[in-house]
């Protein structure tokens, strides 16, 4: 969540972003997870309850609402077996970045969940992560 939010609210403080399994769109996330306790707790409720000021404030700050300000390169890492934050959140963010013309890269692990555990995938993760930083921070 925080990386996607910062991408639209950073006033040129960052040269590049990397998001690993982040939440991009609070509204679609509400319907994509089975962990309703956490999402109701974190967001204050559902997005369609207009009388719930806490929830409405949360959803008003969903990162997808700030894509119009995205202008900084972003690499997005996700695992297709992530059942807490579905990989479709990453796909939405990647699609938005591409449509905005923001330099972006999607690294998708088809056999990983929220964390990268397989040794060969850890090597790829590190190579991609530090390669992105080298590209934009040197």
Name each model feature, range by range.
Residues 1-138:
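Active-site-proximal cap/loop segments of hydrolase catalytic domains
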């Amino acid at each position: 969540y925080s990386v996607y939010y910062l991408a639209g609210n950073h006033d040129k403080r960052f040269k590049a972003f990397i998001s690993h399994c982040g939440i991009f769109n609070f509204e679609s996330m509400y319907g994509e997870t089975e962990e309703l306790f956490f999402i109701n707790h974190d967001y204050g409720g559902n997005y369609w309850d207009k009388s719930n000021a806490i929830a409405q404030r949360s959803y008003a700050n969903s990162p997808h609402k700030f894509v119009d300000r995205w202008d900084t390169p972003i690499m997005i890492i996700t695992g297709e077996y992530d059942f807490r934050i579905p990989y479709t959140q990453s796909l939405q963010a990647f699609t938005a970045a591409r449509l905005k013309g923001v330099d972006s890269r999607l690294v998708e692990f088809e056999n990983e969940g929220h964390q990268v555990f397989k040794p060969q995938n850890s090597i790829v993760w590190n190579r991609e992560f530090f390669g992105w930083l080298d590209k934009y921070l040197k």
